[in-house]
């Protein structure tokens, strides 16, 4: 679909890049010639992904980082900048979620999700954006949303609220930073039957199940 090395010279950070959708995006970016960085909570998981993508010829590094902590985010971004210069792209993919009646959600449970999705996405976008503005870099941010921000997300209110915040951050900063040449976009790709996501959102359902196909009018996936 794309020319080989179409992303050569690009430097892209994918948060939550050790597993699932983040891993697949990181692998694709690397296959197209980008220098890729991934971050997540567990260095061991990141190392496995780094080794796998490197074996396939990709250029990638992984950093364990708690994106809920702004100081940790800034330290990681400084490290990446020193490693080879400014990033040209950021993918806000890291997220967390669980199924629960909202009446049972505790403040700690709410913060477990909102601190990753809402705060973490802002910390990363701000850390990259301020550096891009200072250095005159025309960077790009892609944030991953969910359809809950339009349709509502019963039993996933902390995530739905947080993703709605990321959506309005994207629109607001696109308007505010556009004149710097910084682009911000967001996509809601829908559910991917990865092990981690399905265990949290559809407990007991096989990732190979056709149950979700039945929700699609044309039965296509």
Question: What are the roles of these predicted feature ranges?
Answer:
Residues 63-75, 107:
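The beta1-alpha1 cofactor-binding region of Rossmann-like NAD(H)/NADP(H)-dependent oxidoreductases
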Residues 3, 179, 191-221:
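A glycine/serine/threonine-rich, flexible loop-to-helix segment
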Residues 16-20:
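Conserved glycine-rich cofactor-binding loop
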Residues 125, 162, 170:
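Active-site helix of classical SDR
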């Amino acid at each position: 679909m794309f020319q080989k090395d179409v992303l050569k010279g690009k430097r892209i950070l994918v948060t939550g890049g050790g597993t699932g959708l983040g891993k697949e995006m990181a692998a694709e970016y690397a296959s197209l010639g980008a220098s890729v960085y991934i971050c997540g909570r567990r260095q061991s998981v990141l190392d496995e992904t780094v080794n796998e993508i490197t074996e396939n010829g990709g250029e990638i590094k992984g950093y364990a980082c708690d994106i809920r902590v702004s100081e940790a985010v800034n330290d990681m971004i400084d490290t990446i900048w020193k490693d080879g210069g400014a990033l040209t792209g950021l993918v806000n993919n890291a997220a967390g979620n669980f199924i629960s009646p909202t009446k049972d959600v505790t403040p700690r449970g709410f913060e477990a999700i909102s601190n990753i999705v809402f705060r973490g996405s802002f910390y990363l976008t701000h850390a990259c954006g301020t550096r891009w503005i200072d250095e005159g870099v025309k960077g790009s941010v892609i944030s991953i949303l969910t359809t809950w921000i339009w349709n509502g997300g019963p039993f996933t209110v902390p995530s739905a609220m947080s993703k709605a915040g990321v959506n309005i951050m994207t629109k607001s900063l696109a308007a505010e930073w556009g004149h710097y040449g910084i682009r911000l976009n967001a996509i809601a790709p829908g559910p991917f039957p990865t092990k981690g996501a399905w265990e949290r959102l559809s407990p007991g359902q096989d990732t190979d199940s056709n149950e979700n196909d039945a929700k699609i009018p044309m039965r296509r996936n």
